[in-house]
């Protein structure tokens, strides 16, 4: 998967914003490059010095907060769920994160890194999805966790 620079987008940021409610600066997925319905998805996030969190974490030695790496994985997991269903099944739906287990951080993510976010479905029952997520930079694991999320009706 180190050839991610050459991979074509399956879904760009405009398409992502049609499926996720997140918007900059909290939208943490730039594009989807691999997708197998109900199985797996790979997305990318370019980490730049312009990210607002680097102003305070940490000014002299900027490091992406681990919780935001998990959020990026959770957004990729939400995309996997919504892209796996028919458009009429996800219309007026939103994915809510229900839990995170086994989160581990292996190395810092710094400006200039490109996060590769890989999520896989481990179980799905009705509207509830369980998935594993692994974030990599240059092929090295930087974070991993298990996620549970639910597709629910959007409140109006």
Curated annotation (Swiss-Prot):
The EC number(s) this enzyme carries: 4.2.1.59
BP GO annotations: fatty acid biosynthetic process; lipid A biosynthetic process
Annotated GO MF terms: (3R)-hydroxyacyl-[acyl-carrier-protein] dehydratase activity
InterPro entries: FabA_FabZ, FabZ, HotDog_dom_sf
Reaction it catalyzes: a (3R)-hydroxyacyl-[ACP] = a (2E)-enoyl-[ACP] + H2O
Gene3D superfamilies recorded: Hotdog Thioesterase
Keyword Transit peptide carried by entry: no
GO cellular component: cytoplasm; membrane
Intracellular or extracellular location(s): Cytoplasm
Enzyme active site: 57
Annotated keywords: Cytoplasm, Lipid A biosynthesis, Lipid biosynthesis, Lipid metabolism, Lyase
CDD domains: FabZ (cd01288)
Known role: Involved in unsaturated fatty acids biosynthesis. Catalyzes the dehydration of short chain beta-hydroxyacyl-ACPs and long chain saturated and unsaturated beta-hydroxyacyl-ACPs.
NCBIfam families, per the entry: fabZ, PRK00006.1
Name used for this protein in its record: 3-hydroxyacyl-[acyl-carrier-protein] dehydratase FabZ
Species the sequence originates in: Anaeromyxobacter dehalogenans (strain 2CP-C)
Name of the encoding gene: fabZ
């Amino acid at each position: 998967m180190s050839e991610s620079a050459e991979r074509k987008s399956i879904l760009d940021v405009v398409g992502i914003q049609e499926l996720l409610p997140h918007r900059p600066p909290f939208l943490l997925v730039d594009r989807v490059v691999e997708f197998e319905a109900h199985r797996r998805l790979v997305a990318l996030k370019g980490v730049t010095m312009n990210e607002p969190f680097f102003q305070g974490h940490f000014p002299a030695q900027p490091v992406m907060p681990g919780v935001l790496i998990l959020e990026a994985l959770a957004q990729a997991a939400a995309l996997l769920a919504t892209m796996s269903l028919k458009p009429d099944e996800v219309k007026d739906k939103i994915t809510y994160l229900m839990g995170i287990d086994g989160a581990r951080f292996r190395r810092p993510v710094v400006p200039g890194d490109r996060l590769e976010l890989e999520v896989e479905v481990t179980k799905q029952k009705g509207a509830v999805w369980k998935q594993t997520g692994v974030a990599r930079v240059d092929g090295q694991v930087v974070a991993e966790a298990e996620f549970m999320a639910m597709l629910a009706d959007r409140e109006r």
